[in-house]
Amino acid sequence: GSHGDWVGANRTSIQDFSDNFNYTFLNYDDYGHRHSPIYLIFLSLFLDLGLDINQVRFFHLHLSISLILIFYQCLRLKFINVNNNYLFLLSLIIFLSPTFRSLAIWPDSRIPGLIFFVLTIYFFLKFRITNNTKYTWYTCASLVISSYISPNFSIFFPYFFFFFLKEFGFKKLRFLIVFNFLASLPILYYIFILDVNFLAAGNTPGFSNESIGFSFNFSNKIMIVSSIIFFHLSPILIMGDTFSYFKNFLFKNFKLLIFSSAC
C-alpha cells in the first residue's frame, strides 16, 4: 500500500536524492520499485531548502487538494447548464476515495501524475469549446509532464494523437509531433542509454526478500503495451467515422508501422 511504498522506498529515495543526487539518480533502479523518480527529485528540493521530511509530507498533502479544484473546473466546462454549487459538491466526492486519502498522506508520484492528467483533460475540453490551437500544445505538454511523473498515463497518448491528427492532419500537426518526440528523448536516454530501468522488475517496497522477477524484453513490451492500448481504444475505434479514419491511417502508413515494429 501507500504506507509501504513510503516507508520501503519513497522516503529513503527523497532523502538520498537530497544527500547524493548523482549517485541516486544513476542507481535509482536499485530501490526496487517502478515509480518515476521525477516527483521524488522535486520533493528532495524541499529538503535542500531546510524543510524536514514531515514538512515535505505536509506540502504534498495540500498539493493533492488541487486535484479536486482542477476536476471541478473540468466539470464546469463539460456541464455548463448545471449549477456550479452542485458541480463543486460532486468534485468533493474524490475525498471519499481511500486511495486518494492514503496517497495524499504518504507522498507518491500517482497523485501529482493524476493532477497533470486531469489538467490535460481540462485543456482538451478548452480546445473542444474554443477550437484554439494553443490548447493542443497545453494538452500535450501537461500529458508529457503527467507521463514523466507517473508513466502509466502515457498510455493515453494514442487517443489524443489520433484525435488531433483527425482534426489537423500531419502537415499542421508536424511541429507538435516533433515536440512530443523530443519530449520523449530524456526518458528513453535515461532508461536505455544510462540503463536505469526502473520500469523493469524490482522488489516490492515494504516487504523484505520478496521480489517480482521478470526479464525486460523491449520487443515483448511493445507487443504487450500495444495490445493494451488497442483494447482500451476499441470502443472509440468501432464508432463509424473514427474507425474508418483509423483503418485508412493504417493502410497509408503500413510500411512505416512495419519498419517501426522491426526496429
Predicted regions and their residues:
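Loop-to-helix entry region of an early transmembrane alpha helix in multi-pass inner-membrane enzymes
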Residues: H33, P37-I41, L49-L69, F88, ...
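Membrane-lumen/periplasm interface segments of specific transmembrane helices
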Residues: K172-L250, K255-C263
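Membrane-interface transmembrane helices that cradle and orient dolichyl/undecaprenyl
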Residues: K78-N84, V118-T136, S146, L165-F168, ...
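Membrane-interface alpha helices of multi-pass inner-membrane proteins
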Residues: L90-L92, Y135-S150, P158-F161, F181-L185
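Short acidic/glycine- and proline-prone juxtamembrane loop motifs at membrane-interface regions
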Residues: S102-P112
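Transmembrane-helix signature of polytopic, membrane-embedded enzymes
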Residues: F71-L96, L114-I115
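Specific aromatic-rich, kink-prone transmembrane helix
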Residues: I70-Q73, P112-I129, W137-Y138, S142-L143, ...
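Membrane-proximal lumenal/periplasmic loop motifs of glycosylation machinery
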Residues: G1-V7, N20-L40, I53-R57
